[in-house]
Amino acid sequence: MERKLSLRRRQKLLKMSKAIGMVECQTISTGIQCADLMLKTAEVEILESQPVCPGKYLILMTGDLSAVKASVDEAKTAHSQKIMGSFVLGNPHESIFPAIYGATEVGDVKALGVVETFNSAAAIVAADAAAKTSLVSLIELRLARGMCGKSYLLLTGDVAAVTAAIERAETVASEDGMLLDSSVIPNPDKRLWDTIL
């Protein structure tokens, strides 16, 4: 049995189904229960189901929009007290998964935008909104590993595009009170880029 889906398999599943959803649980036990419940609720495919810092659990799935929504709603209803974040995106931006899995090919780097959130769900939704707002490239979307449960996104593009994208991401992440911090660096030093890329 294959434990983890390869990046290629994840991208293929996304092309077939389009919608993605996530539930971020307070505990590992609840997370595993939610993953089982979500699979039994509707025809969805689990892309990620794993513990993250600090002892939380992420479930990321794909499928038809109605199936993903039904699965997320069922998990939220059954375990409302232990759900820290969730979302359903009907048409996620194509750059989301390469950014999550460190497979983004970044060509021309210009301005740098950073958004940091208190949970993973907010970071993904903010990244999706940013990428759809202006012509920017998502560089990385780091989810809750080694950062006490926080997450962040990095993106690049022209200063105006990065500024607009970061402002949109801030607005989206603030809706649930999950925005921690953000910045736009108009012209990052090349040595900084060397450490990021």
Where are these regions (language model features)?
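Short, glycine-/Ser/Thr-/acidic-enriched flexible segments
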Residues: 66
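Long, contiguous binding/interaction regions
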Residues: 7, 17-55, 69-102, 106-150, ...
